[in-house]
Amino acid sequence: MNAVEKFKPKVMDLDMLSTREVEHGTIYEMNTPQGKAKMHSYPVFGGVELTFQEVTMKEIRHRAKPLEGMFEIHYCKEGRIECAFDNGKVLYMDENDISVGWKESPSYVHSTKFPTAFYKGINLSIYIPKAQEMVNKFVGNDSIDLREICNRFCNDFEFGF
């Protein structure tokens, strides 16, 4: 079976994380005196990754990077997360909140805080250039336009809800 290209590392500060390959996925971890963060990322198929996150710290000072064609859906299962973006906007998520948005603008760069020092969440990352190739193989060219579907949530804006 062909290995599925990982795109999650293209938007993360890998120098801050330890990385290890496990069966069917990758674990990214950060251990500091202030706490821990762990992400278990699974490639679903080309251009789509599902990531489970668990954090037990107040803040992660990182510089998430934009990636043209990247769309994400986030779900906060437990705890709380706050992302302060370079454009001055702030995203707050509490338990059972969902957010969607494009991660392709330079203003996507952000830092992250966890006011309760605890967070569990899931995110679905869709890298449109690769995912569209896979969808085209399954259902035929031009049958489904992933960017158009994602824009129904964000209407070409950076953030949906």
Regions found by a protein language model. Give the residues of each.
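N-terminal low-complexity or simple alpha-helical regulatory segments
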Residues: 1-68, 74
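Short, acidic Gly/Pro/Ser/Thr-rich loop/turn segments
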Residues: 60, 82, 131-133
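Short, charged/polar low-complexity linear motifs in solvent-exposed/disordered segments
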Residues: 57, 68-70, 82, 100-102, ...
